[in-house]
From Swiss-Prot:
This is Protein O-mannosyltransferase 1. CDD domains: beta-trefoil_MIR_POMT1 (cd23281). Residues 105-139 have a biased composition (Low complexity). Interacts with tw/POMT2. It is found in: Endoplasmic reticulum membrane. The keyword Endoplasmic reticulum applies. GO terms for biological process: muscle attachment; muscle organ development; protein O-linked mannosylation; regulation of synaptic activity; sarcomere organization; somatic muscle development; specification of segmental identity, abdomen. It comes from Drosophila melanogaster. Rt/POMT1 and tw/POMT2 function as a protein O-mannosyltransferase in association with each other to generate and maintain normal muscle development. One of its GO terms (cellular component) is endoplasmic reticulum. It catalyses: a di-trans,poly-cis-dolichyl beta-D-mannosyl phosphate + L-seryl-[protein] = 3-O-(alpha-D-mannosyl)-L-seryl-[protein] + a di-trans,poly-cis-dolichyl phosphate + H(+); a di-trans,poly-cis-dolichyl beta-D-mannosyl phosphate + L-threonyl-[protein] = 3-O-(alpha-D-mannosyl)-L-threonyl-[protein] + a di-trans,poly-cis-dolichyl phosphate + H(+). The gene is rt.
Length: 886
């Protein structure tokens, strides 16, 4: 037997030399993919420990395929290979007898004689495993002869082909994904230009897109990316932006490219189904469960309706879904690899784009940060990672998922400001400096006006931050007593008025001077100097005293002093404090200087209170004097319109104020960062709410779809577009949330008791679904309970998509539990469960088709048809012919 063993070894040495010329140097990284079962050599020998030690320390024997095998690895999948005997157990060895190793075996080769293995043993075994007929028909000796003849493995052929054709791309088509896309495309694009009328928020978004086409500045509470993309598309379709969007339901003009206006939202809605499918695959769900998720997206009526019109939700949902899918792939990629770089960049770009379409998209970015932190926390348990590698993981994620979304956001707003450089109807909401930077904006009222404020200046004082209004007074006085029985000074009212008016003009006066005419050497007002402000029309000076304000009794009343010849003397002195003098200097300048006017007698600051006066104050906004020392934004003012007094005659001054002309001139310039900060503050803190809207709803009404939204009604029939979801799908998805939460609590308690009901692999999938889908739902739903503005059902759609994803996982997990625990006769429960799923899916399809007229608005519906679809009393469908609400 020893001679036979030696002859076999000699022949294998020759084979190894041939393979050495064909293959590359083996590297240890090829061992990383080995399974745990093949990482341990379990010797079946019953010899002594000394024999085992001697064998393990001896030079590695040669495998049946001619390459040197590692001691801790079986060389191949051939059961007749003698090196596999300890792993395979008792096998039939008809071809090559297995020699029994001795305590001191004969060395089979020296390091110089043995050729290093160019690839891992597993890669060679896998290259042969796809050919079972060859492994069955050929013996181990024939396999050696075939290898010695120069036959390359499949992996080697793949490498050779890649080297010879470096610019080739292997294309793989997923039929599930393409089928879902085609189904969604057909439903979204069917009669896309119908109805040819303004539908719901197309009124607002259409206006903004038209202003983009004409470069006119507008103000919107949401970021501009979605509107920019649609504007770019319709500009290619020949739209010039001259259509006037006046009211919901108004017909579009024949020249209006309705199809191209609605194309991008519809395309994003079509891509959402395959995006959901791929996201579920990345979450380790089966293809059938993933396909179910994509199909449910196609069959939901609310997602269909929202993606057929000029609305932003479909773009938001697509960017969110693709971003999270790329993030999951990114976390499984090797640090620094090409896949790691591209998937991380794609995830960051998509999540940044989601937040730049609507602010709610930043909730998805928050979910991404949560997933990244969870993954980093898990990496801390990996003993194979050094501290340097852990820091690289953390820093690279921070740079990618902070830097790239921030760059996307800033880039979109840079384009926004560069495009919208002309003044428009929304200018007044911005500060004077911002308006002055627009073509034909505030520059129209600053032509030729002096810069420095002096004794004798005629000015309008604008509330700089927050609500747009100007310091205003009129002849009316405060009531003697307020409804709460408090008394007032009965002085002339001072308010903050939201419109341009002649009563907004004030005169700046030195307390020691009477002549208001500005001479050749103007008396410039500087920081810290004392002035009086005299109302231009009534000629009464701005005053404050220790009398409680009308609507804000904790602050002082501000008035224009009327001398009633009583003991209450006027307190008319105000100190000018320039707050931005570090950049603008100590001289009080028009437009750019931000000032606080402090009442000298009481040290109270002139402040906009934010409250509205009743009818006796003409519903204008209250102005008070606040003794709070801290600088508040509502106490900051700036001079907007400014000119010097040229005459002492009061009537002539009044005539000049009434007939002042606004002539356009060149615009001033402010930095991009100044514009961005101002616009962001307005967008975040000055959003207009629609009180008591008949179709508004509360967050607790969304999971069970208690209220919908009427988007459009045909003027001739009861055909309408009404936002409703697939009620069976919505209710089932809500139950899925409860089922997952219950299972999570159950598993957590059982695992605490060291009872492991499911496999570790399934538990990891369960946790991943919770981290991604359950947390995604919570993070997109709970914040709305803290929002103080009018909300609608479509605000729930991002959370609904995550709820849909979680439902797909729950469906698959329940199937797993039934297959695991219902064995034997219980297998009928698995079949029954799957039959119920099919029936449920048929029900979802049936409800989708029944309510589809509300998504398209193309079919005229009778009164009875509309009534038959009112399944809940809270659904307020709109009816024609004197039936406004049912």
């Amino acid at each position: 037997m020893s001679a036979t063993y030696t002859n076999t070894i000699t022949q294998r040495r020759k084979t190894a030399k041939v393979r050495q010329q064909q293959q590359h140097q083996w590297t240890g990284s090829d061992l990383s993919g080995e399974s745990n079962e093949r990482l341990h050599f379990r010797s079946r020998s019953t010899n002594s420990m000394q024999q085992h030690t001697a064998i393990s320390n001896s030079p590695s024997p040669l495998c049946c395929n001619g390459a040197r095998a590692l001691t801790m690895l079986n060389c191949c999948v051939d059961v007749n290979c003698h090196l596999n005997a300890p792993l395979r157990g008792s096998v039939n060895r008809h071809t090559t007898p297995t020699p029994t190793p001795t305590a001191t075996p004969t060395p089979v080769a020296t390091p110089k004689q043995a050729s290093p293995s160019p690839t891992s043993d597993r890669s060679r075994s896998l290259s042969r495993s796809p050919s079972p007929s060859r492994s069955r028909s050929l013996s181990c000796q024939k396999q050696i002869d075939k290898n010695s003849a120069g036959a390359a493995s499949a992996e080697e052929r793949k490498t050779a082909n890649a080297s010879s054709q470096p610019f080739t791309v292997n294309l793989r088509i997923d039929l599930f994904s393409w089928t879902l896309f085609l189904l969604a495309f057909g439903t979204r694009f069917y009669k896309l230009a119908t109805p040819p009328h303004i539908v719901f928020d197309e009124l607002h978004y259409g206006k903004y897109i038209s202003m983009y086409m004409r470069n006119i500045f507008f103000f919107d509470q949401h970021p501009p990316l979605g509107k920019q993309l649609i504007a770019g598309l319709v500009s290619l379709a020949g739209y010039d932006g001259n259509y006037t969007f006046t009211r919901i339901g108004e017909p579009y003009s024949p020249e209006m490219p309705i199809f191209w206006f609605r194309f991008l939202p519809a395309m994003c809605g079509s891509l959402l189904a395959p995006a959901v499918y791929n996201l579920l695959l990345e979450a380790k769900l089966s293809r059938w469960s993933s396909a179910l998720g994509g199909l449910l997206v196609v069959l939901d009526n609310s997602l269909l309706t929202q993606s057929r019109f000029v609305l932003m939700e479909s773009m938001l949902l697509l960017a969110t879904t693709v971003g999270i899918a790329c993030l999951l792939r990114f976390q499984r990629s090797r640090l620094g690899s090409l896949e790691w770089f591209f998937t991380g960049t794609a995830a960051a770009v998509c999540l940044g784009a989601a937040g730049t379409v609507k602010y709610v998209g930043f909730l998805a970015l928050g979910l991404a940060f949560y997933l990244l932190c969870r993954h980093l926390w898990q990496l801390l348990y990996d003993a194979g990672l050094t501290d340097r590698q852990l820091w690289m993981h953390a820093i690279s994620r921070l740079l990618i998922f902070v830097g790239i979304p921030l760059a996307v956001y800033l880039g979109v707003f840079y384009i926004h400001f560069k495009t919208l450089h002309r003044a428009g109807p929304h200018d007044s909401i911005m500060t004077s400096a911002f308006q002055a930077s627009l073509d034909g904006g505030l520059a129209s009222i600053t032509k030729g006006q002096p810069l420095a404020v002096v004794h004798g200046s005629q000015i309008t004082l604008r509330h700089t931050h927050g609500r747009t209004c100007w310091l205003h007074s009129h002849a009316a006085v405060y009531p003697v007593r307020y409804p709460d029985k408090r008394g007032s000074s009965h002085q002339q009212q001072v308010t903050c008025y939201s419109f341009k008016d002649v009563n907004n003009w004030w005169l700046v006066k030195r307390p020691t001077k009477e002549n208001l005419v500005v001479g050749d050497e103007p008396d410039i007002i500087r920081h810290g100097e004392i002035i009086q402000l005299v109302h231009g029309i009534t000629s009464r000076a701005l005053n404050s005293h220790d009398v409680a304000a009308a609507m804000t009794p904790q602050c002082q009343e501000v008035s224009c002093y009327i001398d009633y010849e009583i003991k209450m003397a006027g307190e008319l002195l105000w100190r000018v404090e320039i707050l931005n003098r570090d950049s603008e200097g100590d001289i009080w300048h028009a437009i750019k200087s931000e000032v606080r006017l402090v009442h000298v007698s009481t040290e109270a600051s002139l402040k906009f209170s934010g409250r509205q006066l009743p009818e006796w104050g003409f519903n204008q906004h209250e102005v008070v004097a606040d003794r709070e020392k801290a600088i508040h934004e509502d106490a900051i003012w700036n001079v907007e319109e400014h000119r010097y007094t040229q005459t002492e005659d009061h009537r002539e001054r009044e005539r000049q104020m009434l007939t002042a002309e606004m002539i356009p001139t060149k615009r001033t310039r402010i930095s991009f960062w100044a514009k961005l900060l101002e616009l962001q503050s307005k967008m975040l803190f000055q959003t207009k709410s629609v009180p008591n809207h008949m179709y508004s709803s509360m967050p607790h009404e969304w999971p069970l779809m208690d209220k919908g939204i009427a988007y459009w009604l045909d003027s001739q029939s009861s055909a309408q577009i009404y936002l409703l979801g697939n009620i069976l799908l919505w209710y089932t998805a809500t139950m899925g949330i409860l089922v997952y939460a219950g299972l999570l609590a159950f598993y957590a308690m059982r695992r605490q008791r060291l009872c492991f009901d499911i496999s570790e692999q399934e538990w990891q999938r369960f946790v991943l679904a919770g981290d991604t889908f359950f947390m995604g739902y919570v993070m997109h739903y709970i914040p709305y309970f803290c929002v103080d503005r009018t909300l609608f059902l479509h605000n729930y759609l991002p959370a609904f998509v995550f709820k849909l994803l979680l439902l797909c996982f729950v469906v698959e997990h329940l199937d797993y539990l039934l297959r695991r625990f219902c064995t034997g006769r219980g297998v009928h429960l698995v079949r029954l469960y799957r039959l119920m799923l099919i029936l449920w899916l048929v029900g979802v399809l049936s409800i989708f088709s029944k309510f589809i007229p509300f998504s398209y608005g193309a079919r005229k519906m009778t009164l009875n048809e509309v009534r038959s679809l009112r399944w809940k009393d809270t659904w307020d469908f709109v009816l024609h012919k004197n039936h406004h609400l049912y």
